[in-house]
């Protein structure tokens, strides 16, 4: 069954790669290129999963995640944060604001696909 996945990232090459991978996995994909448009897309489309970059213009991934977790209507949306920031404090902050999982860039597409399947199955 096809799931709705929102890719929220401002880096074009990452978006192309993630979009290809998620479509290959059979998901319906939409894209947001900054924090405010990501939040708007989450509120209107209610995706099953958001691949959320931490460092984006307008609002950070942390701020977007916090806003989503503060909205009961969006409780079912899974969030996988993606970031080049891999320090323990960054990971703890991402999970602390409500992300379901956190992966650091660069990541293997195999690991990402497995994590997405795991999150969508739960």
Predicted feature locations:
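Short hydrophobic/Thr-rich beta-strand motif most characteristic of the beta2 strand and flanking loop
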Residues: 26-33, 41
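C-terminal output helix
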Residues: 107-116
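Conserved Asp/Asn-Gly motif in the active-site loop of CheY-like receiver
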Residues: 32-36, 91
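Receiver (REC) domain active-site loop signature in two-component systems and cognate sites
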Residues: 56
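Active-site beta3 strand of CheY-like receiver
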Residues: 45-51
